[in-house]
Amino acid sequence: MSQDFVEIAKIGATYKLNGELNLYSLANSIETLLSYGDWYIQLPATNVWQQLKGESVLKRADKVYIKLANINNADTAKKYVNALIGVPKRALPQLAEDEVYFKDLIGCSVKNINNDSFGVVVDIIETGANEVLVCKEDNSEYLIPYVKQYIVSEDLNSKKIVVDWEYDY
């Protein structure tokens, strides 16, 4: 993805015959998703972000549907299935010094203070009490609590995290 945009949603299957589409939020809540101003779209076959011309967004319970401008039937809407919705990075709130966006942790290599590798962060689980880094190295998967007690250092520019954690924890 372009460095200038952050993915906030993905378009799913068509909904109804008038060209509405399911919208799957990648933000931490639907309210956060809807709070961003201008949205941009990246079609599945391209790496180009274009400003999205939406006609309407409908929220029903925990689902969101989008109607794009000039799309009036399901057949035309199908070309947008699996497209990404993004916002410019500058639209994101400024973080405090000790905060990070979880998306920036994905792909970071993780080693402990003894230089033992836990692989790379492939996912983050939100447990309620704290978040957990899901790290993969070859055929092994490691779960490391993402709390100050275990995170020794983070260098997101170099995509490196050092933890105070052992294989047998």
From Swiss-Prot:
<feature type="domain" description="PRC barrel">
    <location>
        <begin position="97"/>
        <end position="169"/>
    </location>
</feature>
<keyword id="KW-0143">Chaperone</keyword>
<comment type="similarity">
    <text>Belongs to the RimM family.</text>
</comment>
<comment type="function">
    <text>An accessory protein needed during the final step in the assembly of 30S ribosomal subunit, possibly for assembly of the head region. Essential for efficient processing of 16S rRNA. May be needed both before and after RbfA during the maturation of 16S rRNA. It has affinity for free ribosomal 30S subunits but not for 70S ribosomes.</text>
</comment>
<dbReference type="InterPro" id="IPR011961">
    <property type="entry name" value="RimM"/>
</dbReference>
<dbReference type="InterPro" id="IPR011033">
    <property type="entry name" value="PRC_barrel-like_sf"/>
</dbReference>
<dbReference type="GO" id="GO:0042274">
    <property type="term" value="P:ribosomal small subunit biogenesis"/>
</dbReference>
<keyword id="KW-0690">Ribosome biogenesis</keyword>
<dbReference type="InterPro" id="IPR009000">
    <property type="entry name" value="Transl_B-barrel_sf"/>
</dbReference>
<dbReference type="InterPro" id="IPR002676">
    <property type="entry name" value="RimM_N"/>
</dbReference>
<protein>
    <recommendedName>
        <fullName>Ribosome maturation factor RimM</fullName>
    </recommendedName>
</protein>
<dbReference type="GO" id="GO:0005840">
    <property type="term" value="C:ribosome"/>
</dbReference>
<dbReference type="GO" id="GO:0043022">
    <property type="term" value="F:ribosome binding"/>
</dbReference>
<keyword id="KW-0963">Cytoplasm</keyword>
<dbReference type="InterPro" id="IPR036976">
    <property type="entry name" value="RimM_N_sf"/>
</dbReference>
<dbReference type="GO" id="GO:0005737">
    <property type="term" value="C:cytoplasm"/>
</dbReference>
<keyword id="KW-0698">rRNA processing</keyword>
<dbReference type="GO" id="GO:0006364">
    <property type="term" value="P:rRNA processing"/>
</dbReference>
<dbReference type="InterPro" id="IPR056792">
    <property type="entry name" value="PRC_RimM"/>
</dbReference>
<dbReference type="Pfam" id="PF01782">
    <property type="entry name" value="RimM"/>
</dbReference>
<comment type="subunit">
    <text>Binds ribosomal protein uS19.</text>
</comment>
<dbReference type="Pfam" id="PF24986">
    <property type="entry name" value="PRC_RimM"/>
</dbReference>
